[in-house]
Amino acid sequence: MSSSGTPDLPVLLTDLKIQYTKIFINNEWHDSVSGKKFPVFNPATEEELCQVEEGDKEDVDKAVKAARQAFQIGSPWRTMDASERGRLLYKLADLIERDRLLLATMESMNGGKLYSNAYLNDLAGCIKTLRYCAGWADKIQGRTIPIDGNFFTYTRHEPIGVCGQIIPWNFPLVMLIWKIGPALSCGNTVVVKPAEQTPLTALHVASLIKEAGFPPGVVNIVPGYGPTAGAAISSHMDIDKVAFTGSTEVGKLIKEAAGKSNLKRVTLELGGKSPCIVLADADLDNAVEFAHHGVFYHQGQCCIAASRIFVEESIYDEFVRRSVERAKKYILGNPLTPGVTQGPQIDKEQYDKILDLIESGKKEGAKLECGGGPWGNKGYFVQPTVFSNVTDEMRIAKEEIFGPVQQIMKFKSLDDVIKRANNTFYGLSAGVFTKDIDKAITISSALQAGTVWVNCYGVVSAQCPFGGFKMSGNGRELGEYGFHEYTEVKTVTVKISQKNS
């Protein structure tokens, strides 16, 4: 343990064996109904890691049936004490902590994530989040309401039922825990579809769910593709709620499918084009570093990426100079290799999209300060790229890039920069850097974003609600607000002979 309380980084596993590649339903492993499998790759080497059973509509139907059975009135799960649900979640957190090294290695190998980030950040976050959710299990409660007349009225916060949960590829394990933690704490059952690029850690966690003692059918995990397995979840008539993290484009399809089927509840955590506003009085070293990590963390593959940096005119040139200097320090390579500080993009589709947007920036007149192209002969690597002299109408200033590409814009007045920052379809997050508390509060109140960070960026914790305004999504995850998304409120009114205050 280091002096800061952060665990030391252990040597990663070099002989990782992938044990779980099947569909997990009713605490058992199943082959796909169709007999199909799909390949899973290492994005740093482009090598195939394994073949995973490919779930589709028939497999989702099986999983939903199991989840519905587990949710029946009188089932072991429905009659379990809330505190016991919490104990199972605490147990799952302990098992993930036990397998932390294996899961971090797997996340790095399958997702291109730096091993140090996977172990120190992602796994730590998963364990803390599960324990936070476990603590809430017996604290979700209704209230009594003094209505007029001789009646006794109270509310119950009941689990919604069977919840479909569709997980993204950029934070496979973190997002799995963000989804199942609150859902299970509230007493729901779940059908999970991990991203087809990164299903391996979810399937390992499935084995831990069984080991922890969750009843059969409470958690079901169906790997597969979005247009088949994901679509089956979104449109399923016996799923009561769907939660999705991913692109705005797919989020629209999911909400449409939910509406056309059974009007299932929907929470969406979608894309962003988050502004980061740096005022002239800001601590420049701090602002440069947070803004840098805000866009380059995990190769830029973050929904909250600070991908529009607005810098006040008087400090613009110096901010650009320091940002370029910082971006040039990366060591690219296999994220499992010690010393490497930037890994690959997830797949060729994302890699090609990023390079296309970089080319658009060059053509539209932005100044390329560094990077600007691919790196290496193997794997989906993109050079860390910084553009200055970016204007608001350029594609790189409007479209979500999801890559290691920083756009730095200039502003003169607060009114101007607030309007420009809000001039987007997105509204996930934002950053403000200033030593003036009045300006910090004024700007943060004016920004249309679900989270605003002041003199920092990307600080996410289980205790805080997370979600977007506008086309960055609906609903909130985590914090007390996140649990409301997994309950229905029922009002019960009882006629009594005499009411007494």
UniProtKB/Swiss-Prot annotation:
Keywords: Acetylation, Cell projection, Cytoplasm, Lipid metabolism, NAD, Nucleotide-binding, Oxidoreductase, Phosphoprotein. Expressed by erythrocytes (at protein level). Changing residue 458 to N: No significant effect on aldehyde dehydrogenase activity. Prevents the inhibition by ALDH1A1-specific inhibitors. Its EC number is 1.2.1.19, 1.2.1.28, 1.2.1.3, 1.2.1.36. The modification N6-acetyllysine is found at residues 91, 128, 252, 353, 367, 410, 419, 435, 495. The N-terminus is blocked most probably by acetylation. The modification Phosphothreonine is found at residue 337. Pathway: Cofactor metabolism; retinol metabolism. The modification N-acetylserine is found at residue 2. The record marks 170 as: Transition state stabilizer. One of its GO terms (cellular component) is cytosol. Transmembrane segments: none annotated. GO terms for molecular function: 3-deoxyglucosone dehydrogenase activity; acetaldehyde dehydrogenase (NAD+) activity; aldehyde dehydrogenase (NAD+) activity; aminobutyraldehyde dehydrogenase (NAD+) activity; androgen binding; benzaldehyde dehydrogenase (NAD+) activity; GTPase activator activity; NAD binding. It catalyses: an aldehyde + NAD(+) + H2O = a carboxylate + NADH + 2 H(+); all-trans-retinal + NAD(+) + H2O = all-trans-retinoate + NADH + 2 H(+); 9-cis-retinal + NAD(+) + H2O = 9-cis-retinoate + NADH + 2 H(+); 11-cis-retinal + NAD(+) + H2O = 11-cis-retinoate + NADH + 2 H(+). The active site is at residues 269, 303. SUPFAM superfamilies: ALDH-like. It comes from the Eukaryota. Residues 336-501 are annotated as: Mediates interaction with PRMT3. Cytosolic dehydrogenase that catalyzes the irreversible oxidation of a wide range of aldehydes to their corresponding carboxylic acid. Functions downstream of retinol dehydrogenases and catalyzes the oxidation of retinaldehyde into retinoic acid, the second step in the oxidation of retinol/vitamin A into retinoic acid. This pathway is crucial to control the levels of retinol and retinoic acid, two important molecules which excess can be teratogenic and cytotoxic. This is Aldehyde dehydrogenase 1A1. The lineage of its organism: Eukaryota, Metazoa, Chordata, Craniata, Vertebrata.
